[in-house]
A protein has these predicted regions:
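Non-heme Fe(II) oxygenase metal-center motifs and adjacent flexible, charged/small-residue loops
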Residues: 1-217
Length: 217
């Protein structure tokens, strides 16, 4: 983990079979360390960028890929940023992989994370409901979880079912929260409908919301 990074769990909510919300998982000092690390990685070569999706439209979030690059045009993971600038993808730092593994374990899963996508949300950013299904068939079939860490402003997160038309449950993810879904919940639809501005902790070192999502390819 990052030096001195501590974890705790103030609350653990089973949202659905295979989906766990870990409230207040990271104390404030650990959040600050993690924010600083993300901004450091994002300022380096092959750092934060704005993805352009099919149809030529920019996404409303800035993105940083570690371990493998997610191509917004092909929906595939790659070793280079083929749809952006052809730069090689930065590796996933060991301390971040360790954090993801700890979160997964605390939610009842085992995983070997090798991908992290950091999404940087501003006040008007959204993320439409979607399934995370671009990982390997073996990983998805095994139910290897998606592990999420929220930093900064609170997000109104939508968690749905296995069909796009299924009802969604709104969940407010606050700074320091973890959210893990795998097993029977691995292919549930999810998204972000709103960012609640100026709700993050004072002195965190970031405006908006950083969301780290870890996966096992």
């Amino acid at each position: 983990m990052l030096p001195g990074l501590d974890v705790r769990t103030a609350g653990r909510t089973l949202v659905a079979p295979g989906a766990v919300h870990l409230q207040a998982y990271l104390p404030i000092e650990s959040q600050k360390q993690l924010v600083a690390r993300c901004l450091e990685l994002g300022a380096a070569d092959a750092g934060f960028y704005t993805p352009i999706v099919r149809g030529g439209h920019p996404m409303s979030v800035r993105m940083l890929c570690l371990g493998r690059h997610w191509n917004a045009l092909t929906y595939r993971y790659e070793d280079t940023r083929a749809d952006i600038d052809l730069r090689p993808v930065p590796g996933l730092p060991e301390e971040l992989a360790t954090l993801a593994g700890r979160l997964a374990e605390d939610a009842g899963f085992a995983m070997n994370p090798d991908i992290c996508i950091v999404n940087w949300y501003s006040a008007g950013s959204r993320m439409g409901t979607h399934q995370d299904k671009d990982e390997s068939p073996e990983s998805i079939a095994a139910g290897a979880p998606v592990v999420s860490v929220s930093l900064g402003d609170t997000a109104r997160f939508l968690f749905g079912g296995l069909r796009r038309k299924d009802p969604v449950q709104p969940i407010f993810l606050e700074s320091g929260d973890g959210f893990v879904f795998g097993g029977p919940a691995r292919l549930r639809y999810h998204g972000v409908s709103r960012i609640l501005t100026n709700t993050g902790p004072q002195g965190l070192g970031v405006q908006g919301r950083l969301n780290l999502t870890f996966r096992q390819f």
